[in-house]
Amino acid sequence: EPSAGAFVTGLLLGFVVLSLLQRAYWRRIAAIADFVLYLLWSILVSSWGVIHYVLFPPKGVTRGIVAVPLEVQSRFEIATLASAITLTPGTLSLEIGESQGQRMLFVHTLNLIDPGATVREIKDGFERRILRATRGPDAI
């Protein structure tokens, strides 16, 4: 007969068995949690930035598009990266294309100050965490 105690026991036993069979299981779970927390933090910080931008518009704002060279390869990884960028206020994933033989994600930003810094922020923030979550902590 199903009960809450049986469910919790089965859940815990499942975690133990998985951790014994796959050594990287907990590291992968930690990488996924790291990505989710980073995404939530980015949404929060960017929301405040957009609120400030709307209430106190800066002079000489430069909206722009940056081309982010992709290390993510699978459709799932690319979709996750594009979705994370679009979920973050002030940025929007536009298109996936190629430039000089390299697959690129084109991203529109609300306030583009330094294109290189924006690309590094996306690659070091979102892309690196996605690769760790999908390919394992040793992927990068």
Describe every region a protein language model picked out.
Residues 1-50:
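Membrane-targeting alpha-helical segments
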